[in-house]
Amino acid sequence: GKVVSASMSEVTNGWVALVIKAADKKLVCVTQGECPLTAMWAVENSCEQDGLHVDIMSLNANNAAVIRRFVKWAAPSACGTKGTSIGFSDWLGAAGGCIAPLFAKKQVKPVLAEYSAADSVLLKRNFLEAVDAATWGVFETGYKEGYGANAEGLKSEEDIVKALLYGYSMIGLDLSLIHI
């Protein structure tokens, strides 16, 4: 396969990157010595070669969470007070990899993961799938300037906790059921 060089990132005692072979994308981690990530990956295949440990993995929710934790630029971040943020209503999660590079060196930050509780039922898509799609898109392009993740229309404490646990940088509450 071909290594997506923009995704190559240093981790403790090794490197992680996306590899594309035909239409299939895999995550590959190459380490030497002890690496805390090895125990966290959901590994499909692994081998040892010349003192190097190689893990080959699918792009799943578990591995996206590990990437967000150890490759900080691939995780959503707060938009802050500098510049502007723009959302794209990319409810299908297909545009993150295409849109992010357009914002390189700009004072505008893209909101790449957008989750709406109402739309999720129609799309059959949950919190995690939305942020994972943005994570993999950003990781593949190597976009390191930050992006936002928005979860809106949240009605329950459970949904708020999930959004925060999954790394959403902005949440919107639906207070229509609150009685004063």
Describe every region a protein language model picked out.
Residues 118-144, 148-162:
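N-terminal active-site wall of soluble small-molecule enzyme domains
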Residues 64-67, 90-94, 101:
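Low-complexity, highly charged intrinsically disordered N-terminal segments
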Residues 95-111, 166-170:
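Catalytic domains of carbohydrate-active enzymes, especially glycoside hydrolases
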